[in-house]
Amino acid sequence: MNFVLALTVNTLLALLLMTITFWLPQLYPYMEKSDPYECGFDPAYPARIPFSMKFFLVAITFLLFDLEIALLLPLPWALQTTNLPLMTTSSLMLIIILALGLTYEWSQKGLDWAE
């Protein structure tokens, strides 16, 4: 009963908030207010310069490998199961996939900064 009540209240609250944001008028920002502030002077450089694609690729690679390391963390507890060959095989497969991904990224020069 408590679960149904909490689910109903949360659903109604989410629908209410979505309805309010849909029907509120759209605010149009002024160009003066959206300009970057640099000590009262006009900015010396544009504020919205594009960033390097190399940096983006390295950041995405870091996030992917960080997530996969988070998958490796519970392996010591998982290896205490009764079906040890299955857990060992799946652990080795995950590590092999990580190693193959790293070697592919390395061979494609995705981790090299200097060109």
UniProtKB/Swiss-Prot annotation:
Entry annotated with the keyword Electron transport: yes
Lineage of origin: Eukaryota, Metazoa, Chordata, Craniata, Vertebrata
Name of the protein described by the UniProt record: NADH-ubiquinone oxidoreductase chain 3
Function: Core subunit of the mitochondrial membrane respiratory chain NADH dehydrogenase (Complex I) which catalyzes electron transfer from NADH through the respiratory chain, using ubiquinone as an electron acceptor. Essential for the catalytic activity of complex I.
Species the sequence originates in: Pongo abelii
Top-level enzyme category: translocase
EC number: 7.1.1.2
GO molecular function: NADH dehydrogenase (ubiquinone) activity
Major location category of this protein: mitochondrion
Cysteines joined through disulfide linkages: none
Subunit description: Core subunit of respiratory chain NADH dehydrogenase (Complex I) which is composed of 45 different subunits. Interacts with TMEM186. Interacts with TMEM242.
GO cellular component: mitochondrial inner membrane; respiratory chain complex I
